From Swiss-Prot:
It comes from the Bacteria. The chain crosses the membrane at residues 13-33, 39-59, 81-101, 112-132. This is Uncharacterized protein MG406 homolog. GO terms for cellular component: plasma membrane. Keywords: Cell membrane, Membrane, Transmembrane, Transmembrane helix. It is a multi-pass membrane protein. It is found in: Cell membrane. The keyword DNA repair does not apply.
């Protein structure tokens, strides 16, 4: 998977994810307002603060992880384990809100889909970005490498 400590690429990926999510949200907004399906619209709008929080967290994640270099490995492992569990609980909050707080106002399926859209898009982009980044780095390193002839490349008679 992609190395999220590379700050420039992480910012680019986070902004791509946010823009794609906003494009989908605007499409749903136009569809819901033209067909009067406001429950679906509310279902899609409910996870938006959590997605924005996740994007901000993704942008600041590299700096945050660098602070843990001096701690022991066991403490860091415990922290990261709880961090990843808490991240998925953060994605669960909008679904629980839509399900328990007046279900007639929120379309629960739209809330689930829009909540899952962000982490799935992050996974897809990171797995698509990794081979592209690897290929580009190899291509650049091959272009910058100068060919130096050595004695091993000559035929010996």
């Amino acid at each position: 998977m992609y190395n999220w400590t590379n700050k420039k690429l992480t910012k680019a990926i986070a902004l791509i994810i946010l823009v794609l999510w906003l494009v989908v949200l605007v499409g749903i907004l136009v569809w819901a307002l033209t067909t009067q399906h406001l429950k679906v619209l509310y279902g899609w709008l409910l996870p938006f603060p959590f997605v924005a929080l996740s994007v901000v967290g993704l942008l600041k994640l590299g700096d945050f992880f660098e602070k843990f270099k001096h701690l022991s490995k066991q403490r860091v492992t415990v922290f990261f384990g709880s961090f990843f569990v808490a991240r998925y609980l953060l994605y669960l909050i909008p679904v629980l809100l839509a399900f328990f707080i007046r279900p007639q106002y929120f379309h629960v399926i739209a809330t689930i889909i829009s909540t899952l859209f962000f982490p799935l898009l992050k996974i897809v982009i990171s797995f698509a970005w990794l081979p592209l980044e690897y290929h580009c780095k190899n291509l650049i390193s091959k272009l910058n490498k100068k060919h130096v002839t050595t004695g091993d490349s000559f035929k010996r008679t």
